[in-house]
């Protein structure tokens, strides 16, 4: 019996983006780390991401060693010498674990509320919701043809086979038509199937993107949507942008037609079994009612996505509960999460800092993931699902995602305005809903349902009045010459953004993107829009 150590992460979903995980050292990692510390071996476990990776040398400790005599069966006969391993150092964080968990759950609840409202208002359609459950692998379409598939799954699969054959026939029609459609003439459905075909050829390195002459006139027509896939692929063959060695064709003697036939055959053969092509087919089955909302809801129970409930299952089956009300209830109760749907919005982040010490007390990235399933030997199936997940849970939305900061930027604009004497704390600016001084006539968030009327600085911050800060951005742009100048306004905004450190990384000990400050449209930049692109950190 041999003892071994494993990493066990508590409350993994809340902390995974911060802590990261460990794993077996790769050849490249070994070469890099062994060059620094020759005690590394090819059997070591190391930090792969997050704090585990950043503090690898601190957490590592030292390997133990035994010199032994063994018999011909490899059994130890005598221990010649032994060195005990030494544990690495402990790492203490400023994070408040309870606050981290609460923040994660509140953030998820807030995002779920927005998704729920968007569905109720019609901004997200129920067909989008039903397909999202398939597209993001919540409903596993690969189980539909299993021997023990349910009657519902079998019915859906039978319908799918019919529609898949029709989709492949649509492709073949275009590939061999004497008058094929250009991309701009196609339906959205057919264009999706064509897009799949071209992406497949790229991903399999059959279409050699590095060889494509982007200035080529035929390629330009393709880019503009004014060429059929048949004409484009024929041109790719002629220009030798196709690696024919990867096709089932005699590369020495094949002519253009034979190569084209092999290319089309490759596409349609792959489409028969490709999961991404299947999802394109399901995408159009849902709005065409070839797979129903009721079927999807029943499958959520049958595949164990939701805890089985006999009463609810029966009511769904007999129509007492409608699929839409069922799904809305599950979203409202977060039994189906925003991350599972991966509809907009499905991600978020929040950082809470102690203003007295500067310590970070919570740093949440939503959605999280179970880093236990990546440590101590990767769960390959789970890792594949993470990589396919449309909500991208391995991306740290707190430190890596860059977005327009929006109204939080207004405090910086206020500081710039006060410091450059275009504002005073008592100056009042009229909010009448629309800012008329620039061509795009931006509006206040309260317009057209109302206006803020006269606002001073304190009330403008309280109400987050866009007009007040549009005016401040405009006044910064006229400060030097009395004439509006974009560059002058942007220079002032960049100056104060730099003073606040927004153009630099925060220095956190995990992967972090570098924010960029707006370079145009100071009126919009003043409310955190324009091309401001800033991380939460």
Where are these regions (language model features)?
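Non-catalytic accessory/assembly modules
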Residues: 1-51
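Amphipathic alpha-helical blocks
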Residues: 57-65
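Beta-lactam-recognizing serine transpeptidase/beta-lactamase-like catalytic domain environment
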Residues: 65-83, 95, 112, 120-407, ...
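Conserved beta-strand/loop elements of the cytosolic catalytic core of P-type E1-E2 ATPases, chiefly
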Residues: 89-99
